[in-house]
């Protein structure tokens, strides 16, 4: 009996040690240092640095004897690049007597996702459509009792729950997918609209007008879709709140009154009297391609069922005009050499472990251009997405050291959080809910491409409640990164980084993955989640 107990505890010790030996901080340091070095030139897709990055990840997967998803570890992602020629393009609003030219950058930002050198809109009627949301699970339909085909829709950003801070309405102050600008353009296209102008307001958008101006002006990279964007609306854009109020006034409408009315599910869309939009959009177009890097560890029993571990490999590249200490390389050490290093270490860990289900390791491209690599994988999947059990995403993990918590972005989404809690309880850690749910970060990283297809996903970070220093010190580190380092040349690797917390995060993830990979569990979205019906439809 004594011998048996000794053997049992020895086995437990070996298992524990094996985890810590395989999830090695020194390997994380090595990968992050290499991927964020000047040699990789900021990892911009379509550049020499981008090629180096893809090949580095590919060779790592290959060295572990992981299988390619198809014939190669590199999965092509076709891209289009369009620049609106503002000297030849315009948007104006006219009524029976006046033509109002909207000033690009100052009053309006506009573009098209239809890959055409030029397109025009002539006298399209303006309609105020409230929030532009169709959400059956909330009994909400802003498009009821109105035909918007060929019309220009003017709408509010975010969703009604944010404005009222009512937890019973959508998700209260927490943004839902229905509040995201990308959803609003998608829904308008499904409804047959010709153009959309979203009214910008800083608080519900969670960023100032300057962000809109810089993000949607100049070069716009998108997927080169097979239909060349023919299913998108002709014109997508934003207008300032002041511009919106001016247009409502010209139409004889009270903007603030209608904004309040739009908070009610009985709201009925309002035609903006005689106001019509005309536009001409002229594009300079080019095409390129990048690649996702994918590898599979085949399962023994259910090889066609998958657990996903993912991160985006791209960053912002080089900006020759930058003069900060003559540093023009955006190295992206935290964003997102950390995440890539994480999935490379998880691949290393699982390469020698047999599982019943297959494991999919995916490093996606063009996240910084709008989550394009993950979107392409999800839209043209090389595997059956209905057999994708769950996904784990790593994006910009702070080297903050050991913490008592794990932050779950988009907290309250799926049963993956229950599994995470069970694992954290075993080691005396806890889940910290998303501290800023109103900013909608859950919808701003690559896992959302899979959530939109119904796949439960977990987007977690290593936490801020430091074992040494507590939440105050952790938040200081996080805020310093956000304010001084995020998307700056200063996002560089340091050998002094404390990656012990990240290593613990990866160990916890490995245990969650192991549980799902050796069972027939199918985690579900929580009731009321906007992706729940999609998942249930796929399973049926």
Model-derived segments and their meaning:
Residues 30-106, 185, 198-216, 221, ...:
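Protein/peptide-recognition domains central to ubiquitin and immune signaling
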Residues 92-96, 109-145, 227-332, 348, ...:
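Soluble metallo-hydrolase cores and metallopeptidase-like ectodomains found primarily
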Residues 14-23:
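Bacterial Sec-dependent signal peptides at the C-terminal "C-region" and cleavage site
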Residues 103-227, 233, 306, 328-331, ...:
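Extracellular/luminal Protease-associated
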Residues 173, 177-179, 203-204, 317-416, ...:
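Acidic/histidine-rich catalytic neighborhood of metal-dependent amide-processing enzymes
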Residues 41-167, 273, 290, 415:
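Noncatalytic luminal/extracellular "stalk/propeptide" segments of secretory-pathway proteins
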Residues 105, 118, 144, 223-257, ...:
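Metal-dependent peptidase/peptidase-like ectodomains
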Residues 341, 348, 352, 462, ...:
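His/Asp/Glu-rich mid-to-C-terminal helical/loop segments that flank catalytic regions of hydrolases
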């Amino acid at each position: 009996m004594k011998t048996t107990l000794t053997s049992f505890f020895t086995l437990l010790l070996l298992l524990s040690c094996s985890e810590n030996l395989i999830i090695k901080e020194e390997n994380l340091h090595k990968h992050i240092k290499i991927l964020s070095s000047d040699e990789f030139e900021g990892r911009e897709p379509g550049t020499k640095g981008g090629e180096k990055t893809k090949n580095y990840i590919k060779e790592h997967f290959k060295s572990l004897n992981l299988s390619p998803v198809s014939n190669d570890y590199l999965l092509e992602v076709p891209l289009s690049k369009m620049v609106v020629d503002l000297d030849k393009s315009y948007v104006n609003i006219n009524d029976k007597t006046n033509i109002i030219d909207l000033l690009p950058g100052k009053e309006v930002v506009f573009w098209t996702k239809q890959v055409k050198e030029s397109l025009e809109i002539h006298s399209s009627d303006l309609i105020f459509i409230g929030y532009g949301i169709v959400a059956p699970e909330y009994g909400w339909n802003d498009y009821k009792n109105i035909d918007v085909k060929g019309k220009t829709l003017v709408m509010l950003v975010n969703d009604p729950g944010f404005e009222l801070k009512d937890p019973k309405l959508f998700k209260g102050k927490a943004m839902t997918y229905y509040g995201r600008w990308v959803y609003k353009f998608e829904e308008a296209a499904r409804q047959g609209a010709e153009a959309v102008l979203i009214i910008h307001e800083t608080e519900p958008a969670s960023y100032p007008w300057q962000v809109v101006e810089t993000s949607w002006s100049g070069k716009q990279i998108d997927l080169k879709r097979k239909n060349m964007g023919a299913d998108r609306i002709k014109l997508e854009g934003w207008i300032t709140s002041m511009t919106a109020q001016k247009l409502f006034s010209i139409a004889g409408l009270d903007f603030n009154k209608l904004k309040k009315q739009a908070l009610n599910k009985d709201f009925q869309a309002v035609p903006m009297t005689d106001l019509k939009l005309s536009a001409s959009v002229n594009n300079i177009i080019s095409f390129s391609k990048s690649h996702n890097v994918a590898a599979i560890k085949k399962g023994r029993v259910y090889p066609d069922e998958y657990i996903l571990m993912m991160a985006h490999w791209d960053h912002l590249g080089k900006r020759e005009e930058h003069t900060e200490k003559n540093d023009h390389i955006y190295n992206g050490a935290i964003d997102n050499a950390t995440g890539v290093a994480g999935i490379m270490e998880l691949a290393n860990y699982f390469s020698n472990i047999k599982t019943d289900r297959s494991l999919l390791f995916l490093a996606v491209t063009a996240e910084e251009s709008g989550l394009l690599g993950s979107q392409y994988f999800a839209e043209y999947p090389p595997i059956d997405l209905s057999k994708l059990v769950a996904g784990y995403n790593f994006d910009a993990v702070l080297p903050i050291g050991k913490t008592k918590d794990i932050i779950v972005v988009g907290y309250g989404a799926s049963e993956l959080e229950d599994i995470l809690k069970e694992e954290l309880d075993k080691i005396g850690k806890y889940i910290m809910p998303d501290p800023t749910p109103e900013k909608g970060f859950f919808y701003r990283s690559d896992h959302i491409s899979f959530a939109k297809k119904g796949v439960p996903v977990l987007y977690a970070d290593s936490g801020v409640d430091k074992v040494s220093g507590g939440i105050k010190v952790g938040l200081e580190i996080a805020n310093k990164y956000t304010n001084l380092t995020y998307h700056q040349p200063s996002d560089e690797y340091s050998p002094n980084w404390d990656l012990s917390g990240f290593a613990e995060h990866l160990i916890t993830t490995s245990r969650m993955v192991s549980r799902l990979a050796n069972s027939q569990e199918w985690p579900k979205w929580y009731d009321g989640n906007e992706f729940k019906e999609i998942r249930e439809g796929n399973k049926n």
